[in-house]
Curated annotation (Swiss-Prot):
<dbReference type="InterPro" id="IPR047090">
    <property type="entry name" value="AspRS_core"/>
</dbReference>
<keyword id="KW-0030">Aminoacyl-tRNA synthetase</keyword>
<feature type="site" description="Important for tRNA non-discrimination">
    <location>
        <position position="30"/>
    </location>
</feature>
<feature type="binding site">
    <location>
        <position position="491"/>
    </location>
    <ligand>
        <name>L-aspartate</name>
    </ligand>
</feature>
<dbReference type="InterPro" id="IPR002312">
    <property type="entry name" value="Asp/Asn-tRNA-synth_IIb"/>
</dbReference>
<dbReference type="Pfam" id="PF01336">
    <property type="entry name" value="tRNA_anti-codon"/>
</dbReference>
<feature type="binding site">
    <location>
        <position position="172"/>
    </location>
    <ligand>
        <name>L-aspartate</name>
    </ligand>
</feature>
<feature type="binding site">
    <location>
        <position position="218"/>
    </location>
    <ligand>
        <name>L-aspartate</name>
    </ligand>
</feature>
<dbReference type="GO" id="GO:0004815">
    <property type="term" value="F:aspartate-tRNA ligase activity"/>
</dbReference>
<dbReference type="Pfam" id="PF00152">
    <property type="entry name" value="tRNA-synt_2"/>
</dbReference>
<keyword id="KW-0963">Cytoplasm</keyword>
<feature type="region of interest" description="Aspartate">
    <location>
        <begin position="196"/>
        <end position="199"/>
    </location>
</feature>
<dbReference type="InterPro" id="IPR029351">
    <property type="entry name" value="GAD_dom"/>
</dbReference>
<dbReference type="GO" id="GO:0006422">
    <property type="term" value="P:aspartyl-tRNA aminoacylation"/>
</dbReference>
<keyword id="KW-0436">Ligase</keyword>
<dbReference type="Pfam" id="PF02938">
    <property type="entry name" value="GAD"/>
</dbReference>
<protein>
    <recommendedName>
        <fullName>Aspartate--tRNA(Asp/Asn) ligase</fullName>
        <ecNumber>6.1.1.23</ecNumber>
    </recommendedName>
</protein>
Length: 590
C-alpha cells in the first residue's frame, strides 16, 4: 500500500510520486489549504491539499487519529517554513488522492497531553498510549537491543535453545504461578521463575553454550521496577570460569550500549567485592556516579558517653558510620534534613544525626548540631579528620544494627546524590563479586543467590569443615548506575556438594529427592564445570531509554497489583472449567 515511511521522505525525493499510510496526527486549515501531519512509527510528514483538488472535501473531513492512505508529489517547503524537529521537515507532499481506511472516535486522551493523564487511563487504553512517539521509541530500542544480543551470542558460539514453560514447582525465593493439570487431578505445573535447572541440564547434555530470550514469572509483591512476568537474557556455558563469563558479558553489554545509544564503556569494568560495596556504600548495587562514601567511625565512638553512638559501637552486630556531604551547609535546608530523617525511618532508622561544619578554627563552637554537646571535642575532630571534612560540609551519621544502617544510609546516599545532582559521570558499570554463600534470617540459612551457586570450596570436606556463615560463593552481579542488570555464578557440578548445600539450607534428603531428584541424578552422570548469568531485559531497556518506570519498556505491562486494566485479567472462569480441573474456589472471608 505504501511506497515510503514518513522518515524516508526527504529532499532527495523532490518531484517524485509517493504513497504514505498512517494516522492523522494533526489537521490545520490555513486560508483554505488543508495541512495534515501524518504519523507512522518512524515519525511525521506533512501532507498538503489545495482547494482545487478533487479530494479536498475528504481531506477537510479528516480528524485526529483517522487512518489514511495518501498519494502525492514530494515538494520542497517554502523558505522559512521548514520544520527542523522532524526528519522530513524540509519537504511536504502535495496531495493528489487520499483514502480513509478507518475513522476514529475521539480518543480518551490527547497524545500531546499524556502527562496530565493518569496511568490507569493510559494502561486501560494501552494501544492508544503506544501510539506516542516516546513509547514507540522505547519499544523500537528494545527490539534493536534484543537483535544485537542475539547476533552477539550467535557469533560467539551460543545456541538458542527453548526450555519448558510448564514445569515442576521448586522453591526459588518467590511464589510460583501455578497451572492446574486436567489430566492429573490435584496436581499442578509451575510457570518458571527462571530456566535455571533446564539450562544446567543442557550443560550436562553437552551443548556447551546456551542462551535464550525468555519470559519468567514470579508471584511476588511488586515494586516500581518489578513485573509478575519479565524477560531475561539467559546464558550458560561449560568448561569456563568467572573470568570467561565476566569478560564475554562485558563485551556484550559494552557493544549493546554503543550500538543502541552510542555510549562507550571502558573495559574491563571495575570489580568490587560484596564486602567492600557494603562497607563503603551500604548496598551490593552501588551507584558509583555518586562520589559519596561511608566512613567507619565505630572504634572512635566506643568510649563516648553518648549511648546513641557508643551502644552500637560496642555491639558486634552493629556499625557506626559518617557520610560527608561536600558543601552541605548551603545545599541542605532544615526542611530537607527533616525530610531525610523521615526517609531513613522507612528503613528502620530511629533518627538521623548530623553536624554542620561552620568553622574548624573555633573548635566545638564552630560545629552546629544537637549532638555536639554529647561528644568529646577530641572524638569530633578525629571524625572530621577521618572524613576529610572541610568548612561548609555537613556530616550525616548512621548508628545501629548493621542491616538497618546499610539499608537506610545507602538509600540516603543515593537520594542525596539525585537531589543535589552530584553525579560525576553518566555511566558507572561494575561487577560485584565474592558474595556470601548464605544469609541468615530467623536462625535459618538461606541461599544468597540460589541453591545451585557453587561455594568457594573444592570438596565436600571443605564445605563441611567451614562455618556456613563464612562461606563465599562464586557469584557475580553486573551493576550499572545503581541497578543490578545481571546476576550469575559458577554452578555446583558435583552431586555430593549439591546434596550438602541442600542440607545446610534445611532441605532434608527426602525433600531434596522429591523436589530436585532429577537434578541430583543428572549430576551423577558426568557434569562439566559450568556457569552462567541472566540479564533483565526490562531493566536494561530502562537504562538505555532513560526511564525510571519499567512499564514504559513493556508493550502490555501489568499494574503493581499484577492486573491488566486493558483485558481485565485476571478474571473469573466458569464453574464448568473449574469442575473439569477439580478446583473449588474458597470465598474470601470478610
Amino acid at each position: 500500500m505504501r511506497t515510503h515511511y514518513s522518515s524516508d521522505i526527504n529532499e532527495k525525493l523532490q518531484g517524485q510520486k509517493v504513497t504514505v499510510c498512517g494516522w492523522v496526527h494533526r489537521r490545520r486549515d490555513h486560508g483554505g489549504v488543508i495541512f495534515l501531519d501524518i504519523r507512522d512509527r518512524t515519525g511525521l510528514v506533512q501532507l498538503v491539499f489545495n482547494p482545487d483538488n478533487d479530494n479536498f472535501k475528504v481531506a477537510d473531513s479528516l480528524r485526529s487519529e483517522f487512518v489514511i492512505k495518501a498519494e502525492g508529489v514530494v515538494n520542497l517547503r517554502p523558505e522559512g517554513q521548514e520544520n527542523k524537529n522532524i526528519s522530513s521537515g524540509k519537504v511536504e507532499i502535495i496531495g493528489d488522492s487520499i483514502e480513509v481506511i478507518n475513522k476514529s472516535k475521539t480518543i480518551p486522551f490527547q497524545l500531546d497531553d499524556f502527562q496530565s493523564t493518569g496511568e490507569d487511563v493510559k494502561l486501560k487504553y494501552r494501544y492508544i498510549d503506544l501510539r506516542r512517539p516516546e513509547m514507540q521509541h522505547k519499544l523500537i530500542t528494545r527490539s534493536k537491543a534484543i537483535r544485537y544480543v542475539r547476533n552477539f551470542l550467535d557469533n560467539n558460539g551460543f545456541l538458542d535453545i527453548e526450555t519448558p514453560f510448564l514445569t515442576k514447582a521448586t522453591p526459588e525465593g518467590a511464589r510460583d504461578y501455578l497451572v492446574p493439570s486436567r489430566n492429573f487431578n490435584g496436581k499442578f505445573y509451575a510457570l518458571p521463575q527462571s530456566p535455571q535447572l533446564f539450562k544446567q541440564l543442557l550443560m550436562v547434555s553437552g551443548f556447551d553454550r546456551y542462551y535464550q530470550i525468555v519470559k519468567c514469572f514470579r508471584d511476588e509483591d511488586l515494586r516500581a521496577d518489578r513485573q509478575p512476568e519479565f524477560t531475561q537474557i539467559d546464558i550458560e556455558a561449560s568448561f569456563i570460569d568467572e573470568a570467561f563469563i565476566m569478560s564475554t558479558m562485558e563485551r556484550m553489554i559494552a557493544g549493546l550500549f554503543k550500538e543502541t545509544i552510542g555510549v562507550e564503556f571502558a573495559t574491563p569494568f571495575q570489580v568490587m567485592t560484596f564486602a567492600d560495596a557494603i562497607d563503603k556504600y551500604g548496598s551490593d548495587k552501588p551507584d558509583l556516579r555518586i562520589p559519596l562514601e561511608f566512613v567507619n567511625i565505630k572504634e572512635d565512638m566506643q568510649n563516648e558517653e553518648f549511648k546513641v553512638f557508643s551502644g552500637p559501637a560496642n555491639d558486634p552486630q552493629s556499625r557506626v558510620i559518617a557520610l560527608r556531604i561536600p558543601g552541605g551547609n548551603d545545599k541542605l535546608t532544615r526542611k530537607m534534613i527533616d525530610e531525610y530523617t523521615k526517609f531513613v525511618g522507612i528503613y528502620g532508622a530511629k533518627g538521623l544525626a548530623y553536624i554542620k561544619i561552620n568553622s574548624l578554627s573555633q573548635g566545638k563552637e564552630g560545629l552546629q548540631s544537637p549532638i555536639v554537646k554529647n561528644i568529646s571535642e577530641e572524638t569530633l575532630f578525629k571524625v572530621i579528620d577521618k572524613t576529610s571534612a572541610k568548612e561548609g560540609d555537613l556530616l550525616f551519621f548512621g548508628a545501629g544494627k548493621a542491616k538497618i544502617v546499610n539499608d537506610s544510609m545507602g538509600a540516603l546516599r543515593a537520594k542525596i546524590g539525585e537531589d543535589l545532582d552530584l553525579f560525576n559521570k553518566d555511566w558507572a558499570p561494575l561487577w560485584v563479586v565474592d558474595f556470601p554463600m548464605f544469609e541468615k534470617d530467623d536462625n535459618r540459612l538461606y541461599a544468597m543467590h540460589h541453591p545451585f551457586t557453587a561455594p568457594k570450596v573444592s570438596s565436600v570436606e571443605d564445605l563441611v569443615n567451614t562455618n556456613p556463615e563464612e562461606l563465599s560463593s562464586r557469584a557475580y552481579d553486573m551493576v550499572i548506575n545503581g541497578y543490578e542488570v545481571g546476576g550469575g555464578s559458577i554452578r555446583i557440578h558435583k552431586q555430593d556438594i549439591q546434596a550438602k548445600v541442600f542440607n545446610l539450607l534445611g532441605i532434608s534428603d527426602d525433600e531434596a529427592r522429591e523436589k530436585f531428584g532429577f537434578m541430583l541424578d543428572a549430576l551423577s552422570y558426568g557434569t562439566p564445570i559450568h556457569g552462567g548469568i541472566a540479564f533483565g531485559i526490562d531493566r536494561l531497556i530502562m537504562l538505555l531509554t532513560g526511564t525510571t518506570n519499567i512499564r514504559d519498556v513493556i508493550a502490555f505491562p501489568k499494574t503493581q497489583t499484577a492486573s491488566c486494566l486493558m483485558t481485565e485479567a485476571p478474571s473469573t472462569v466458569s464453574l464448568e472449567q473449574l469442575n473439569e480441573l477439580g478446583i473449588a474456589v474458597k470465598k474470601e472471608e470478610r
